[in-house]
């Protein structure tokens, strides 16, 4: 049998199962979505009134949710004044949350003051991973916890793709390598209790449950098809940021980028031996 005949026979066989294959692909794999991070916090059973720091809080959505859902005393920290001002407006009256200017490497809190650090989708922007995780260790109480969500490049991300994407998104190349981050965690004396590889979990969740937020592939196609249309109206820098954001979401879906959730703990006593790696698991 020739190679061409073998290919044709393979396609003939595929035709027999194509409909069944498509039906199976249309069945959900049960993605958990980002709300699963709050489930991780719930599992920690921290008491109401626990002090929680939202590092890189943006406009305050997660900080307010942590305060209202769990009754935590939350301090949201962000380096951007506009975000901090917006976060203060978001917080409802009586909500136990405050916001302040600061960075992951210089948090405006005393040492040993926090029960939990929450940091989602921020540390890819931070070149000084050692400084950030050392600061987390400083601020955490003995036995304090951290929930970190960070996105990394995989071996599927081509050098040319990275050369555009990382500057457009303001990311540090070294921070996009998990080995850099895990070395920083260990150097800081924090323990990795659990490492959760998200893969496409969150992207699938949004596709299934919030489809109106999932136009990234279509938008990327339009941006690439007629760049001058959008550059002329919005400027080259804004064009690059928008294209980068669209590609970021697409790359997360197809495995060129992959997020991880780290559940960390500080030693129970000052001066305890260094950390050891904890367990790894897939999914959200």
Regions found by a protein language model. Name each.
Residues 21-38:
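Conserved SAM-binding loop and adjacent beta-strand
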Residues 118:
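A conserved beta-strand element that flanks and buttresses the S-adenosyl-L-methionine
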Residues 130-145:
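A short glycine-rich, Lys/Arg-flanked "PGG" loop and its adjoining helix->strand segment in the class I
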Residues 196-284:
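Conserved Class I S-adenosyl-L-methionine
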């Amino acid at each position: 049998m020739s190679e061409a005949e073998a290919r044709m026979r393979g396609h003939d066989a595929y035709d027999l199962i194509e409909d069944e294959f498509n039906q199976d692909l249309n069945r959900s794999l049960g993605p958990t979505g980002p709300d699963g991070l709050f489930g991780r916090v719930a599992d920690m059973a921290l008491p109401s009134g626990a002090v929680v720091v939202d590092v890189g809080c943006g406009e305050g959505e997660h900080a307010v949710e942590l305060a209202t859902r769990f009754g935590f005393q939350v301090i949201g920290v962000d380096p951007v004044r506009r975000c901090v001002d917006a976060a203060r407006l978001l917080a409802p009256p009586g909500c136990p949350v405050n916001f302040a200017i600061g960075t992951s490497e210089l948090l405006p809190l005393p040492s040993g003051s926090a029960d939990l650090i929450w940091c989602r989708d921020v540390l890819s922007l931070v070149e000084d991973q050692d400084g950030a995780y050392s600061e987390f260790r400083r601020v955490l109480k003995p036995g304090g916890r951290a929930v970190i969500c960070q996105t990394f490049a995989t071996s599927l991300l081509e050098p040319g793709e990275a050369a555009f994407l990382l500057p457009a998104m303001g990311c540090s190349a070294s921070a996009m390598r998990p080995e850099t981050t895990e070395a920083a965690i260990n150097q800081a004396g924090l323990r990795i209790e659990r490492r959760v590889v998200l893969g496409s979990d969150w992207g699938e969740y949004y596709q299934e449950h919030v489809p109106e937020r999932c136009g990234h592939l279509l938008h990327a196609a339009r941006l690439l098809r007629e760049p001058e249309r959008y550059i002329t109206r919005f400027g080259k820098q804004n064009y690059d940021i928008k294209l980068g954001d669209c590609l970021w979401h697409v790359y997360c879906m197809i495995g060129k980028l992959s997020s991880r959730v780290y559940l960390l703990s500080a030693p129970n006593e000052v001066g305890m031996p260094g950390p050891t790696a904890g367990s790894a698991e897939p999914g959200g």
